[in-house]
Each structure stands twice: as structure tokens, then as C-alpha cells.
Amino acid sequence: MRLATCFCFIALLLNGCASAGGTWIELGGQRYMVEIADDDAERQRGLMFRDAMPIDHGMLFIHDREEPQSYWMKNTRIALDILYFDSARKLVAQQRDVPPCSLGDGCPPYPSDAPARFVLELNAGEAARLKLQDGAELRVGPGVAIPR
């Protein structure tokens, strides 16, 4: 009985450690904890109405297919870097230091220069800090489910 209790405790402890890792990506040697937006409602809401985001956090938008993308900052209160990646998770376009916008539907679009399937939003200045160049690889952690 004591051995079974000990085994159950260890299993629970290990399960807690695995989930504590969270959902992460790596870019430019830096790990970021990310929220995933992989359906229309989540992609539409994005980072709206947030007053701040920890420096090591971001949001990863996953689209069903690679195609030209365009994002805007409607109701977004924090400046962001918007980074576009193709299906191979290579950086194909960057919109750096995009300012917040409170103009509602009057906010300008920020398009990708090439077809993209993944879009990563980080705090403004991160792309410059990492010295990102097109072709940089986005690595995804095991918690990121990528549909085929």
C-alpha cells in the first residue's frame, strides 16, 4: 500500500511539472510563453484590451493554410512586433514597433510581404533586440498543436 501511494504521489508530481512548462516557442535563441489563437474567434480577439504583456510572453496565431496575412491593432493597447512565418516556420515578413490603435475600424492594416501560416505577436522591440532577419526559424514546444 505504501509503495502504491508513493508511486501515485510521484506520478502526480511529474504530471504537474510537465504542465508547468506551459506552451512555448523559441525564436532567436529566446523562449517565449505563448497563448495560441487557432480559430477565427481567438484570432479576431487577439491581444485586444490588454494593458500589458510580460516581456517573455506573446501570442501565436495559427492559420489553416499559408496565404497573405494582414493584421491590425484594433482595440490593442500595447505596441507590438508582428512577425509572419511560412508553413516551414521561417520568418518571411516583419512589422516592427506597431503602435496601439483606438480608432476601431479606422485602424490601419499591417500586411505580410509574403504568404504566411503563423503569426507571432511579441512586445514591440523584441525583433530588434533579437536582431531578427527573414529566414529566422520559429521553434515550437510540445504544447503547440499544429494541424496538418
Describe the residue ranges of each PLM region.
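Compact, glycine-rich, soluble single-domain proteins
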Residues: 18-148
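Exposed boundary/loop context
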Residues: 9-10, 39
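Sec-dependent signal peptide recognition
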Residues: 2-9
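C-terminal motif of bacterial Sec signal peptides marking the signal peptidase cleavage site
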Residues: 14-16
